[in-house]
Amino acid sequence: MTTGRCRVAVFASGRGSNFKALAERCQDPAFSCAVACLVTDDPAAPAITVARDFQIPVHVIDAGPRRGRLRPGAEADIVRHCRDEDVQLIVLAGFMRILEGDVLDAFTGRVMNIHPSLLPSFKGLSAQRQAFEYGVKIAGCTVHFVDASLDGGPIILQSAIAVHDNDDAEMLRERILVEEHRILARAADLFARGRLRIEERRVLGTED
């Protein structure tokens, strides 16, 4: 990858829509980030095809049988892969495993996640459907730094959209996804340019 650009590891378990959007953004040599590798817990994840299309290295980890929890030792394997790839930032983009120890210790303040709700509302799985079924008038997405809590780390960026009368849950999900792609690239760029700083729970440096 290009010298001087922030090397990003993207973690994904599924189709890799956010991964693909970020990889496309990184094709611009003027962009501050480059995707160093994909880390996935699923050897059949469609995100692997995306990585091959962009000639991005793939690391499939032996995560263990339980969805959510990683097997003992898996995080140490992840840290080793990331260090081998000279990773500076980790982006969780639909990674369906919980990071609890080694990764967060090794990359403190350098792990961010994209979540499809306006946190702190609607944490966890199927956040878009949660919001739709609750009847909110405003939905959206959040990029936040990752800590040991569930979707509870300091918020970097958020984007809000109106929920229309004719929306269904899938329509809302697709419109939120457009915003996910936009603010994830923006957050990675702000990190790469050294703009972000955390003061207690606030992330500063996000304004133009």
Q: Language model features by range: what are they?
A:
Residues 1-208:
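One-carbon transfer enzymes
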